[in-house]
């Protein structure tokens, strides 16, 4: 299984600069998406800070983020995972409210993309991964405990 890794994309960077937005768009359309197709990569993991501003998002940026990135990944059949980063949450002490949940959450509990606001283990294609989002007061103990399990028993998944 091949996986593409992205991080710190900061959609809306530089005060929602449209010049930066166009630059990012060229990267995704001319390099990233063709690379996924050419190399038959079906899974993408984003390591956090998918958006730039902690408190709000510009509607133009949001529209382009959804149409040029999220919906394109979905249309390509990409299994997309997002680990919540510090720029993805408005509060420093909790991940409970986060950009991905607010933008893409549904009442039915189905999510695209999949996002992780708490530390947890997942298995992708037979490979175990420990995902740890932005660590803060509300998840510090659980994140530390999961990390210590993997340090003491690196081949064991936490239950």
Where are these regions (language model features)?
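Proline-rich low-complexity regions
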Residues: 56-57, 133, 154
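Extended hydrophobic/Leu-rich segments
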Residues: 70, 129, 149-150
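Short beta->alpha connector loops
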Residues: 133-139
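Short amphipathic alpha-helix with an adjacent loop that forms part of the alpha/beta core around
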Residues: 140-148
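Anionic group-transfer/hydrolysis microenvironments
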Residues: 10, 135, 155
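Single conserved hydrophobic/aromatic residue that forms the stacking wall/gate
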Residues: 149-159
């Amino acid at each position: 299984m091949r996986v593409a890794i992205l991080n710190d994309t900061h959609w809306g960077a530089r005060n929602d600069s449209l010049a930066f937005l166009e630059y990012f768009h060229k990267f995704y359309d001319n390099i990233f998406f063709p690379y996924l197709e050419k190399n038959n990569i079906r899974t993408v993991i984003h390591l956090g800070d998918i958006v730039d501003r902690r408190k709000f998002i510009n509607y133009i940026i949001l529209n382009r983020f959804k149409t040029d990135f999220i919906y394109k990944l979905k249309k390509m059949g990409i299994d997309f995972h997002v680990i919540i980063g510090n720029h993805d949450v408005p509060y420093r002490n909790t991940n409970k409210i986060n950009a991905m949940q607010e933008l893409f959450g549904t009442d039915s509990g189905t999510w695209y993309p999949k996002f992780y606001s708490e530390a947890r283990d997942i298995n992708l294609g037979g490979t175990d991964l420990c995902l740890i989002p932005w660590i803060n007061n509300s998840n510090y103990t659980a994140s530390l405990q999961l990390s210590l399990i993997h340090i003491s028993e690196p081949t064991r998944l936490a239950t």
